[in-house]
Amino acid sequence: MHLKAHFRLSLIFIGLLFLSLPMTITAKDFTIDEMEFTFKNTQTFDDDALGSALGIYEDDLLDIDKVTQGIAGLKKFYFDNGFFEMSVDTSFSFNNEEETASLKFIISENRQYRIDSIIYNGLDKLSPELSRRIYRIKKIEKNKFYNRILIIDQTNEILDRLQNNGYMYARLKQDSGTVIRKFSGNTNSGVKVILNFEGADTLSYFGRTEIVIMDNVYNVDKELLRREIQYNEGDIYSKEKKLLSERNIAKLAIVQSAHIDPDSASIMKVDMTANVKLGPKYEILPYIRGTSIQNHFYFGGGAEYTDKYFLGGGRVLSANIDGLFNSSDLNRLEVSGTFTQPHFIFNKSTFSNKLTVGFYNLEGFKNYYAGNLSTVKYFISDKTFYNSLYLDLNEELVQFRYDDTSSILNIFHSMITLTAVHDNTNNVLSPSAGYYHSISAGSAGLIPKLVISALPNFNYSQFVKFYTGNRIYFNLNKIIPFSIFATSLKVGDIIEYGTGTQLVPVQPIYKFFSGGSGSLRGWNAKENGILANKELGGNFLLEGSIELRKKLFPSKENFMKNINGALFIDYGNVWETSKQFRIDQIALATGFGFRYDLFFGAVRIDFGFKLYDPNDTNAKWLFSDPSKIFKSKFAIQFGIGEAF
């Protein structure tokens, strides 16, 4: 046979063999049992970051199309971080008997480019002050490595600053908004970042705002909605004020949604239309819930009736029946009604009043309860450290019926408390960044002391109570993918004072406790404390936690993607008074847990160990006596929502 014919046949055979490779691979379901990254020169990112960019993980089924897409994603990841000349080679090895595959990615990172210069076009007509504020934005900087995400962040922050200072139509040019110019040579290389803006040459002002209520069957007053608008006609346009106005209107219970849109083509003075959609006025909702009360975890539910426009003016009336269960000895039943009035005295203040009657089974006694809680909330600002102030006035009539005696104690409790709150956390249910801080001071017994002579069958307590709660959250994605570091600190102090024939010590329901699902998790509820009787609580609390939280299966598309893990250390204790506090009596707990994310929060289980128990005279440390570890130094905790 002619040599050329032999050559053609060889090419055809090799081509058919190559084309049959995907068919051979897909004929069986191979599981990826090993994935390796190797580097020809440098390694900048760890394997977890590369695996996340690739989107392929060990124990996945091998899919050639997915591998191809993953390699494209890996190249994009490198490109977005300034590695414009990166290359990757791939090799496969198969074990037909075990039906497994090993993947090897050979990466040449090559040069990582730095930013040589940053040029802004279209901002030459800004005021000197606004120009200075924009040039102080430093998400990207000269001589720092190129990073696409940081360039987007820089651009968005500049646009926000422009649109919050009158330049309503500011934007990047559609055809050439962001220009990246790469240059390289023997002695110098880098990228020029050029951001081309338009619409930053003419100031816009708010014009009139028309409020349109769709299907206003409840005759909702437009002036009620207008009070929530945070700008006036003639003010310089601010996107931030427009969005805040939308949020404020939508917060009214009767409102389902609110959108404020420009209503005129004028650049200088822009009229607006607030389109408001109402929700149903009446609502009855059953619910289930889990909560921690005095360190015990309760589960239960109830039903709530709400009138979202009670007597007009944005007022809300709600009625609840609520039952909670921990055990046959610990359970609660409450009926309550709450009235809420927005714009109380000031636009930023809200008044609410809650009446409650309840029956509570507690450790060693029963409570029959009737109480009234009046609260004034004042919103200060998102820009100040303290965002909100709360003033609470609480009056309670409580009867204690003790299980082991026939004696009855009647208490008239009244307390006024001022609380300041800072909260910039990014999520109510599961924060991943931000800081929460509250500090409160309260005084109990002032009103009872004035009227107690008219209530000869009642007793009261006099004390002041100080408390601060703090939580900080850090997103560790850049260090440990899909991870959060969280820490908390709580300090509380009760100082009793006063004399009188009807004066009694502070009752347990107003004291501090240690141990439990939201406390030191190596102890069961109320089992920790430097106290003669831990179930009666103490007057001084110091307690905190540090916790590492991580998504365990971030790549999964099934139910497993909602499973999270946690490692924690808890510390603290409760004492009779602050004068008895000692550092060597601070207890330590450690352990691990799992969470499953649901729409209402995480369902949580924690396994806690008593790392250091100051009350155990024979084996203070966990491993002092290994035989005790699973007998007296271990606790299982359940909860809904994170521990803090």
Range-by-range predicted roles:
Residues 125-130, 235-438, 521-522, 531, ...:
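Gram-negative/organellar outer-membrane beta-barrel architecture
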Residues 289-294, 406, 413-562, 568, ...:
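C-terminal outer-membrane beta-barrel translocator/porin domains of Gram-negative envelope proteins
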Residues 10-22:
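Bacterial N-terminal signal peptides
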Residues 63-65, 94, 147-149, 165, ...:
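Outer-membrane beta-barrel domain signature
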Residues 27-292, 303-304, 316-336, 469, ...:
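Periplasmic polypeptide-binding modules associated with outer-membrane biogenesis and secretion
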Residues 2-12:
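Bacterial N-terminal signal peptides that target proteins for export
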Residues 583-598:
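Strand-loop-strand
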Residues 249, 305, 339, 470, ...:
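Hydrophobic, well-ordered secondary-structure elements that form the walls
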